[in-house]
A protein has these predicted regions:
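Surface-exposed intrinsically disordered loops and tails
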Residues: 96-97, 187-203
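Short acidic-hydrophobic sequence patches enriched in Asp/Glu that either
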Residues: 20, 156, 204
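Outer-membrane beta-barrel "beta-signal"
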Residues: 166-170, 202-216
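Strand-loop-strand
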Residues: 140-168, 195
C-alpha cells in the first residue's frame, strides 16, 4: 500500500477539514442444520477502509476493531491488535495494558460454532474465533501494526471457548467463556522479545462474555 497524496493544507468546509475514504465490509454467515437439536454456524468477516486525497487516516469511528461478545470473544473489546503490535506499557518490569482503544484499517475475523440443545430452554455451544486488525500504512507509534501478506496468518489471534444459552424465544441470553490460546501481542515476536528481557507478561486468562442474542 502506498502513501496518500493529501493536499497541504487539507481542504475545509465551514472551517473544518473533511475526510475522504473508501470502506468495504463483507460479512458471510452460513448456518448448517445437522438435525433438530444440533447446528453448525460459521462466519467470515472482512473489512477494509482506505483514506485518500484529503485524508491520511480514516475517521476514528469508521475504523475496525476486534474483541468483545460479538467478535473474538477471548479478548476484551478494542484491546487487541493491530497486527503483531504489543499493546502494553512496561512499568516496573511489568507489562500493563494500554488504556487507549486499538483500531485499524483492515479486519479479518472467522468463527466456527457448534450449537446443541441440552434440555428445555438451555442450549450449549463450542466455538473458536480467529482474526485480527491491521493498519494499511506504517504506524510509528504501533510497530508491527501494518498488514503484510507474508506475516498476517501468524498474527491471527485464536480464541476457543464454550457457552451456555437460555432461549426464551423472543430473547436469547448468552454466556460465553473463551480463552486467548494465541495472542499475537503476547505470543508474537514483540511480546517474546520483552519476555527474554525479563519483563513479566500478563497471565492469559479466560474471558467471560454476557450478551443478548447469538454472536452471528
Amino acid at each position: 500500500f502506498g502513501p496518500n497524496s493529501t493536499p497541504i493544507p487539507p481542504y475545509k468546509i465551514a472551517g473544518l477539514p473533511f475526510s475522504n475514504y473508501v470502506k468495504l465490509a463483507l460479512d458471510y454467515r452460513p448456518l448448517y442444520r445437522i438435525n433438530e437439536n444440533n447446528k453448525l454456524a460459521a462466519r467470515a468477516d472482512f473489512g477494509i477502509a482506505v483514506p485518500y486525497w484529503n485524508s491520511v487516516v480514516n475517521p476514528y469511528v469508521k475504523q475496525f476493531y476486534v474483541g468483545g461478545p460479538y467478535d473474538i470473544r477471548a479478548f476484551p473489546i478494542r484491546k487487541m491488535g493491530p497486527g503483531a503490535y504489543f499493546p502494553y506499557d512496561v512499568i516496573d518490569n511489568n507489562a500493563v495494558p494500554k488504556l487507549e482503544d486499538q483500531t485499524a484499517d483492515i479486519k479479518i475475523v472467522m468463527s466456527l460454532e457448534y450449537r446443541f440443545k441440552i434440555i428445555a430452554v438451555l442450549q450449549g455451544a463450542l466455538f473458536c474465533d480467529v482474526g485480527n486488525i491491521w493498519t494499511i500504512n506504517e504506524d510509528e507509534f504501533r510497530p508491527g501494526a501494518k498488514f503484510n501478506f507474508s506475516t498476517f496468518l501468524n498474527q491471527m489471534a485464536v480464541g476457543p471457548g464454550a457457552g451456555l444459552r437460555i432461549d426464551l424465544n423472543y430473547f436469547i441470553f448468552r454466556f460465553d467463556w473463551a480463552y486467548p490460546l494465541y495472542d499475537p501481542g503476547i505470543d508474537g515476536p514483540q511480546g517474546q522479545a520483552f519476555a527474554k528481557e525479563g519483563v513479566i507478561l500478563p497471565e492469559k486468562r479466560p474471558v467471560f462474555n454476557f450478551a443478548i442474542g447469538y454472536p452471528f
